[in-house]
Every structure is written in C-alpha cells, then in structure tokens.
C-alpha cells in the first residue's frame, strides 16, 4: 500500500506491536 515513510513506519510499529498479541497485520 502507498503511504508516506513516516506513516508507514508508524503502521509497521503498530503491526509489530499487534503481532505480539495477534497474528493479524496490515501487511
């Protein structure tokens, strides 16, 4: 998906955070 580097970095951080609890992610 297309997002600015900053937004993508935040989303990735949230994705990693969510991965610890659930196996679902925006990727």
From Swiss-Prot:
Residues 2-27 form the Peripheral subunit-binding (PSBD) domain. GO terms for molecular function: acyltransferase activity. It is found in: Mitochondrion matrix. Required for anchoring dihydrolipoamide dehydrogenase (E3) to the dihydrolipoamide transacetylase (E2) core of the pyruvate dehydrogenase complexes of eukaryotes. This specific binding is essential for a functional PDH complex. One of its GO terms (cellular component) is mitochondrial matrix. The modification N6-acetyllysine is found at residue 13. The modification Phosphoserine is found at residue 15. The keyword Secreted does not apply. Keywords: Acetylation, Lipoyl, Mitochondrion, Phosphoprotein. InterPro entries: E3-bd_dom_sf, PSBD. The keyword Acetylation applies. This is Pyruvate dehydrogenase protein X component, mitochondrial. Belongs to the 2-oxoacid dehydrogenase family.
């Amino acid at each position: 998906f297309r997002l600015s580097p900053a937004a993508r970095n935040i989303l990735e951080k949230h994705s990693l955070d969510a991965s610890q609890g659930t196996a679902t992610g925006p990727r």
